[in-house]
Amino acid sequence: MMSVLTTSQILPAPQVITDPKQIASRPDARVEKTLTIEKLYMTRQVGGATWSPDGKTVAFISNMSGRNNLWLVPSDGGWPMQLTVSEERQTQPTWSPDGKWIAYISDYDGDEQWDIFLVSPKTGQVVNLTNTREISEENPTWSPDGRYLAYIVKPKTSSVFEIDVYDTLMRDVKHLTTGTANDRMNVAPIWSADGKFIVYTQDQSKGTDSNVFLVDVVSAQSTLLTPHDGEYRYSASDVSPDGKRVLITSNAGDGYDNVGLLDIAGKKIHWLTQDKWEISGESFSPDGKFLTYSANVDGNTDLYLYEIASGKAHALPLPKGVNYAAGRTSPFTRDSSRLLYSH
């Protein structure tokens, strides 16, 4: 039995949802109350929720205290505790596999030149891991053994995004991707369960044509997994626990985004959806039995659980609105029994 945990606030009683087709413009309508920019800034927000390795705590980003800082809350419910206190923006929290550290990124005065920080969830000790004002580092992702952090690198004067790996034991950096192509973006590094390779997405066309690559962590040799003719988008969202398949999203074929399983050895895709809505792949469950994907339908985002063995999918019984699986590396607990989502 799988349960779901939401990061949204307590919902009001169900209300009738207006059919968008029935909405008509009224130029003569009066605005009873103006929503000011100041009030918009006062809106409380919660995001970036992610499980602790033992499933007992959820880390998340919130501006409840005025700035986007890191908070912790018991997964069974309770009062949240502010873990970091900073005037700088913080985002993308991710737990180390042993639960001793949480990696996150923070910039300086909103300049979007991000550094990677570590904070101890027990003591609150903060360490600036990269400390490079002229280089932006984003999307930190722990290796399964917790020794390495893969992340995206972009020098301030460059338009190229590359992937580096930081060795927390030796305290040195290895460049996994390099090149000279202008505007190349290597993004979303995803570790295999054995830590031997990383799957990433490369975009050289500003959103119209992209590919999925696999890079060997030791040799830094990259292999193209999605060779194709024409301009189509292929992006990776997760690697199966057995390391044999990649969950991808692509508009190949009819131009609509759909979800498929890419066989790494044969470079063949088994499509899971063939829909006219915008479908996005998300994550495998740790036991390899399920995966999640989302569907944007009539302005609502529905979250689906797909059983790999049977090929059957069903929408999770969530409130109408925008729902998506949370978690920087996985929305599932390690035992695959609980699913974290945002609403």
Positions of predicted regions on the chain:
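Blade/loop signatures of beta-propeller domains
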Residues: 14-35
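Short loop/turn segments that connect beta-strands within beta-propeller blades
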Residues: 74-78, 120-124, 167-171, 216-220, ...
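A short beta-strand motif characteristic of beta-propeller blades
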Residues: 35-40, 79-84, 125-131, 172-179, ...
